[in-house]
Structures are given as structure tokens and as C-alpha cells.
């Protein structure tokens, strides 16, 4: 999985102060999309174990209390992104007690496959559709 941008402190993409990750890869081509640069799967930077560690550390940093994380893009539920997103979400659930997880996707809930639904079962809010 690649990502375009990571904001360790964000007050725009969801409630409260939070972390936000914009991943690469989207097939929806929504009219008016403000993140067209994230559509190509191979754009951006590789999502590494170090980046995953950074996100978990930022979520647990007591100096800046964060309500949770927003996962956007691109599309976090693009089939090629789901394995890494699922791994990240599971780790946040294990290691970041009380943090909420919001996911934005161009898919509608009834279009999701089993692996995408596994992600949805672990998050707090899904903003779905085009």
C-alpha cells in the first residue's frame, strides 16, 4: 500500500483532534474529488512498518490528546489497500484504547466483499458512497 499524506495532528477530517492518513488508489473517480492525485495505486510513498509505528505512537502520545484516526484517500477499502488497512486497524484496536476510527470510501456498504467488511466491523464510522 502507498500513501500520499499523513497528518499527525488534524482537526479537519473528523471530530476532535486526530491523526489522518490519505492512502493511494481509487477507482471511483468521483466528480468534484479534491484528492485526484491519490487515484493511482503506485503514487505516493510506501506505507512501511515505521509509518505504522509512528501512527500508533502518535495516537498514544499524551502531550497531544487525539480522539482517533481518519483513513481517507484515495480509498482505504480499495482491494489492494485492504490487507494493510486491516492490519493497521487491528493494531490500533489492540494498542490504542478508546480511539475512534473513521474510514472514507467510494464503495457503498452493500458493495463490500468479506475482507472489506472485516475492516468495517472494526471501525466506528464509515462514510460510504460517491
Predicted feature locations:
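A generic structural signal for alpha->beta connector loops
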Residues: 98, 122-123
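Conserved Radical SAM active-site core
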Residues: 1-3, 17, 35-103, 109-116
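Short, flexible active-site-adjacent loop segments at beta-strand->alpha-helix junctions, enriched
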Residues: 27, 107, 129
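Residues embedded in well-ordered beta-strands within globular domains across many folds
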Residues: 70, 124-127
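Classical nucleotidyltransferase
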Residues: 113, 127-130
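N-terminal pre-triad scaffold of radical SAM enzymes
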Residues: 2-29
Amino acid at each position: 500500500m502507498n500513501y500520499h499524506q499523513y497528518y499527525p495532528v488534524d482537526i479537519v477530517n473528523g471530530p476532535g483532534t486526530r491523526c489522518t492518513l490519505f492512502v493511494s488508489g481509487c477507482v471511483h473517480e468521483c466528480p468534484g474529488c479534491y484528492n485526484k492525485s491519490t487515484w493511482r495505486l503506485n503514487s505516493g510513498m510506501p506505507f512501511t512498518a515505521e509509518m505504522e509505528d509512528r501512527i500508533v505512537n502518535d495516537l498514544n502520545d499524551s502531550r497531544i490528546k487525539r480522539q482517533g484516526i481518519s483513513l481517507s484517500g484515495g480509498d482505504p477499502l480499495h482491494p489492494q489497500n485492504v490487507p494493510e488497512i486491516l492490519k493497521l486497524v487491528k493494531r490500533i484496536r489492540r494498542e490504542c484504547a478508546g480511539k475512534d476510527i473513521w474510514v472514507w470510501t467510494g464503495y457503498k456498504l452493500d458493495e463490500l466483499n468479506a475482507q472489506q467488511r472485516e475492516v468495517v466491523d472494526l471501525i466506528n464510522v464509515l462514510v460510504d458512497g460517491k
